Amino acid sequence: MESTPKKAPRSKFPALLVVALALVALVFVIWRVDSAPSTNDAYASADTIDVVPEVSGRIVELAVTDNQAVKQGDLLFRIDPRPYEANLAKAEASLAALDKQIMLTQRSVDAQQFGADSVNATVEKARAAAKQATDTLRRTEPLLKEGFVSAEDVDRARTAQRAAEADLNAVLLQAQSAASAVSGVDALVAQRAAVEADIALTKLHLEMATVRAPFDGRVISLKTSVGQFASAMRPIFTLIDTRHWYVIANFRETDLKNIRSGTPATIRLMSDSGKTFEGKVDSIGYGVLPDDGGLVLGGLPKVSRSINWVRVAQRFPVKIMVDKPDPEMFRIGASAVANLEPQ
């Protein structure tokens, strides 16, 4: 009877190798998750502005439609310019009339100035005559007691002195009148400066009646049409700044230790998860509103009672700037996935 050969014992090395590789893979995954944080709690965003007219008026031209892309300098809408054109014409007419008034007044002042120069010469002459008459009277009066002059001579000297003083006062009044005429032109020149400022302001208002795109963007929330009266500083629609797109990714606070400004990131949008976009961390949020109370700004801390022993890590927003965003894919609020590659 033949004996059956015994089977050789199987080596345990392959199984141990598989287990070892699995452990290495597990350690790598854990390390990778810890050092390269990722989150699907993210969304695309961009800066926006409210497009508001700086002057009031009726919209006579609306050059855009809702969700339309625009370039910097493109016409958005135009407010009826006629009231501002009328104000400008009125101000310019006032300036022309004032210039003519200044010219005529200047001619009169020039004539009065010429007369004032003559009056000044007359003033000096009258002042000299008054001084001479006063000196003559002062010398004549003592001679009356000595009998060298008669009382009639003294009266004539006194009359001459009074007449000279009267002539001096008269020419002094003429000089003051000439000086006041010159100051009248200064007032008109100051008034002209005010009219010029009014013209500049009216031109600015006329320019503001035409509203153009301040940057490349996309129009949203447009709910008006031609004929609508637009009030100054009241928004007409919103304009998205499409020059710079970013993703707000909410990471757990335990991941923040590996995140720095400039950390490379890979972005995927839910609308096309097969396409990736490169970016870099711009900044990390430093404040969120706690869901369970916490510190109330401007008051006392409010701490809710809890018997929950499980603490869930808080999430903080991380702003990631996208290098080359696809303008057709990126929309404010679009769901995204962010993967960081700390260096």
UniProtKB/Swiss-Prot annotation:
Q: What is its main location?
A: membrane
Gene Ontology MF, one: sulfathiazole transmembrane transporter activity
Entry-linked Gene3D superfamilies:
2.40.30.170, 2.40.50.100, Helix hairpin bin
Periplasmic-side stretches of the chain, per the record, are 34-343
Q: Which SUPFAM superfamilies match?
A: HlyD-like secretion proteins (SSF111369)
> Where are the bilayer-spanning segments?
13-33
- Name the GO terms of the biological process aspect: response to antibiotic; sulfathiazole transmembrane transport; transmembrane transport; xenobiotic detoxification by transmembrane export across the plasma membrane
Organism superkingdom? Bacteria
In the induction comment, the record states: Induced by LeuO, part of the mdtNO operon.
Q: Which InterPro entries match?
A: CusB-like_dom_1, CusB_D23, MFP_Efflux_Pump, MFP_proteobact
Topology feature Cytoplasmic, residues: 1-12
Quote the subunit structure annotation.
Answer: Could be part of a tripartite efflux system composed of MdtN, MdtO and MdtP.
Which family, according to the similarity comment? Belongs to the membrane fusion protein (MFP) (TC 8.A.1) family.
Name the job this protein performs.
Could be involved in resistance to puromycin, acriflavine and tetraphenylarsonium chloride.
What's the protein name?
Answer: Multidrug resistance protein MdtN
Source species = Escherichia coli (strain K12)
Gene behind the chain: mdtN
